[in-house]
Design a protein with these regions (language model features):
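Conserved helicase motor core of SF1/SF2 NTP-dependent helicases
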Residues: 390-394, 401-404, 456, 470-472, ...
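Pre-ATPase regulatory/linker segments immediately N-terminal to the P-loop/RecA-like helicase/translocase core
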Residues: 76-82, 91-112, 237-357, 361, ...
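Pre-Walker A (Motif I) flank of P-loop NTPase domains
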Residues: 362-368, 393-395
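Mg2+/Mn2+-dependent nuclease catalytic core
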Residues: 2-102
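Conserved RecA-like ASCE P-loop NTPase motor core of nucleic-acid helicases/translocases
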Residues: 372-374, 379, 383-414, 424-427
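Conserved motor-coupling elements within RecA-like helicase/translocase cores
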Residues: 436-465
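A helicase ATPase "motif cassette" and its flanking acidic/Ser/Thr-rich regulatory loops
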Residues: 92-245, 278-284, 317-318, 327
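Switch/connector loops and helix/strand junctions flanking conserved nucleotide-binding motifs
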Residues: 40-42, 82-87, 406-408, 433-438, ...
C-alpha cells in the first residue's frame, strides 16, 4: 500500500542523485535488488552493492532528516532463496565513499581544463588493476581488452592526438556547464532547478506548478501505472512554457513551494502537451495506482538532465582513433577528397542535373550549402536519394539534427513515392516521431521478425535508414549489422563535430561503415549550440590551426 518502486532523489548536500528499487513512502524500509551474485564464499553482500545502498541511506539522511536507526535497509539478491540481507550503516565507509565521489568530480573538472593528455600518458594496465588481481579472467580477457584501448589512445599521430585531446576537453567542459551552468549563469545548467528562484523559473517557462493528476493508466502488461495525465491550471497570458513533446522531465508532489531536492521524484517523458493538460509516460510505473496523486496533492514538472550526449561524444572520439587510417586522414584534411570523373547520371533531374552529377562524382564527401527555400531538402536531397537508389546495391543513411527535420525527411520519402518503392526504417523514439511515421520505427518494422536471423535479413534488405544524429549515436551497433554506401546529413551546420565524428568514423567489420557522406546546410543560419563562449572553445594548438 505504501511501497514506491524506482523512486528517485537529488541530494545537493552530498552531490548525488539515485534511484531506489523499492522503498516505503515513509522512508522506514529501503530495499535494493541485485540480479547478480553476492559474495558466495562469505555468504554476504559485495562491497560495491553495499556502498550503493548506503549512499541511498545518506541521501535520505541529508534530504529528509532521517536517522539510520529508524530505517530498515536490505539488499535482495534475487537469485538466492536466502538472498534478503539486512544491512546497517557504516559511517567510516560512507565518508570514504563521499571522498571518492569528490575525487571523481575533481578529475572531471581537470578534464574540463585539458588534463586528458596527461591522464592518457599515465595509463597502464598495472595502474588500472588497483587490486592486483590475476587469474584467467584478468589475464585472458580483461587485461588484453584494456591494453587494446590504451594502445588506441597512445599509438596515434600527433595530429590525431591533438584532435582527440582538444575535443575531449571541449566535451568535458560542455558536460560540466550543462550541470552547473558555470560561474556566470547557473540558469543554463541542471543545477538551475534549485539555484534559480521560483519566479524566475516561471518567467522562463522552465517549471509547471499547481498540477493535479486526472488519470493514471498502464501503457501495457507489466508496465504498472506509467501514463499520468495532469491538469494544468490557467496561467498568465504572457506565460510561455519551455516544454515540448518528448522532453525528459521530473514530476514531484509538493506542499508549499516546489523544490525537487526535498521530494520523492518520478522521471519520465512528455507524451502529449496541451494548454490545459499534459500526459507523461514514467520510466518506471507504479504497481499501486493510489501511491501517488491523492486528492490534496499538487505537483510540479521540471526539466531532467542526461549525460547521454557527452558519453556519445566520448565514444565518438574513441571511434575516430579506432577508424581506418584513410578515413582519419580524410576527416583531418591530411588528404584531399577524390573525384570520379567518368561517373554519369542514371536519372534526369531537370535543373538539378548539374548539382546531382557533381555530388555523384565526389568519391569521399560532398558539401551542399544553400539558404532556406532553395530546395535543399525538398528537391536536392530527394534527387540525391533517387540517384543513389538507381544503383542496385546502394544503402543510404539519412540523418538530421532535430526530430522535426527527420519528420520532414520522412515526409519527402513518403510524398515522393520513394518509401512505397523502397521502404525505410526510422531509428528513434516514438515520443519524438510524427504519428504518420510511427509505423516506420525500428520496433514496428521488425514486428514480422520473430528470429534473430529474420532481423538480420530485414536489416540487410532495407536500403534506407533515417534518424537524428543522437538516435544513431545511441545505436552505433547498427554499423555492425549494416554497411552504407552513402550517408546524407541535413542541418549539418547545427551539429557539433563530436556528434558526427563517431558516425563518420564507424567501422563495419574491417571497412568503413559509411563509404561516402554528404553534408547539407547553411553556415550563415542557425549555428551549433554550445555552452562555452568563443574564448573558452578557441583552438590554440598549431597542429589543429594549420588544418583550419
Amino acid at each position: 500500500k505504501n511501497t514506491l518502486l524506482e523512486a528517485s532523489f537529488i541530494c545537493e548536500k552530498l552531490g548525488l542523485q539515485g534511484r531506489v528499487d523499492m522503498m516505503q513512502k515513509d522512508f522506514q524500509v529501503l530495499i535494493e535488488q541485485k540480479a547478480g551474485k553476492r559474495d558466495e564464499y562469505h555468504r554476504r553482500h559485495k562491497e560495491d552493492h553495499f556502498i550503493q545502498m548506503m549512499l541511498y541511506q545518506g541521501v535520505l539522511m541529508y534530504n529528509f532528516g532521517q536517522e539510520t536507526a529508524n530505517m530498515q535497509t536490505f539488499l535482495l539478491y534475487s537469485k538466492y532463496a536466502d538472498g534478503l540481507l539486512i544491512e546497517h550503516f557504516a559511517e567510516n565507509l560512507f565518508r570514504e565513499s563521499i571522498k571518492l565521489r569528490n575525487y571523481i568530480v575533481h578529475n572531471e573538472m581537470r578534464l574540463g581544463d585539458g588534463a586528458i593528455g596527461e591522464i592518457v600518458d599515465s595509463l597502464s594496465t598495472d595502474l588500472l588493476n588497483e587490486l592486483q588481481i590475476g587469474g584467467k579472467l584478468w589475464n585472458d580477457y580483461q587485461e588484453p581488452q584494456l591494453q587494446t584501448a590504451i594502445n588506441t589512445l597512445k599509438r596515434c599521430t600527433p595530429l590525431e592526438r591533438a584532435y582527440f585531446n582538444r575535443f575531449f576537453t571541449f566535451i568535458s567542459k560542455e558536460q560540466i556547464l550543462s550541470k552547473t551552468g558555470g560561474s556566470n549563469d547557473a540558469s543554463h545548467g541542471f543545477a538551475g532547478n534549485w539555484h534559480i528562484p521560483l519566479h524566475e523559473k516561471l518567467e522562463a517557462g522552465n517549471i509547471l506548478t499547481g498540477l493535479t493528476i486526472q488519470e493514471k493508466q498502464s501503457s501495457g502488461p507489466g508496465k504498472g501505472y506509467d501514463l499520468i495525465e495532469l491538469h494544468i491550471p490557467t496561467q498568465d497570458e504572457d506565460f510561455l512554457p519551455n516544454f515540448r513533446t518528448g522532453d525528459m522531465v521530473i514530476l514531484y508532489a509538493y506542499k508549499e513551494e516546489p523544490d525537487m531536492r526535498k521530494q520523492i521524484l518520478m522521471k519520465g517523458n512528455i507524451l502529449e502537451l496541451q494548454p490545459d493538460r499534459m500526459t507523461l509516460v514514467l520510466r518506471n510505473g507504479q504497481q499501486n495506482k493510489d501511491i501517488i496523486g491523492g486528492k490534496e496533492e499538487v505537483f510540479a514538472v521540471e526539466h531532467d538532465f542526461s549525460d547521454t550526449s557527452a558519453n556519445n561524444g566520448f565514444r565518438g572520439l574513441y571511434a575516430f582513433l579506432s577508424a581506418q587510417a584513410d578515413r582519419k586522414e580524410l576527416l583531418l584534411g591530411v588528404r584531399p577528397p577524390a573525384q570520379l570523373e567518368d561517373v554519369k547520371l542514371n536519372g534526369d533531374y531537370g535543373r538539378f542535373n548539374e548539382l546531382i552529377l557533381k555530388e555523384k562524382q565526389a568519391k569521399d564527401y560532398f558539401l551542399l550549402v544553400g539558404p532556406p527555400g532553395t530546395g535543399k531538402t525538398s528537391c536536392a536531397l530527394r534527387f540525391m536519394v533517387e540517384e543513389a537508389l538507381s544503383e542496385p546495391d546502394t544503402s543510404i543513411l539519412l540523418l538530421s539534427y532535430t526530430n522535426r527535420a527527420v519528420d520532414e525527411i520522412c515526409a519527402m520519402l513518403t510524398d515522393s513515392g520513394i518509401a512505397e518503392r523502397t521502404p525505410f526504417i526510422r531509428i528513434g523514439n516514438e515520443l519524438s516521431c510524427d504519428k504518420r511515421f510511427v509505423p516506420y520505427l525500428l520496433k514496428y518494422s521488425l514486428d514480422d521478425c520473430p528470429k534473430l536471423t529474420d532481423i538480420q535479413q530485414k536489416m540487410a534488405r532495407t536500403r534506407i535508414f533515417v534518424g537524428t544524429t543522437t538516435a544513431i549515436n545511441n545505436r552505433l551497433n547498427l554499423f555492425t549489422l549494416k554497411h552504407f554506401q552513402l550517408a546524407i546529413i541535413d542541418e549539418a551546420s547545427q551539429i557539433l563535430e563530436p556528434d558526427l565524428i563517431g558516425i563518420l568514423s564507424a567501422r563495419h567489420q574491417q571497412h568503413n561503415a559509411i563509404d561516402k557522406f554528404i553534408l547539407v546546410g547553411d553556415y550563415k543560419q542557425l549555428p551549433a549550440i554550445a555552452q562555452q563562449s568563443a574564448e573558452e572553445a578557441a583552438v590554440t594548438d598549431l597542429l589543429l590551426r594549420n588544418i583550419g
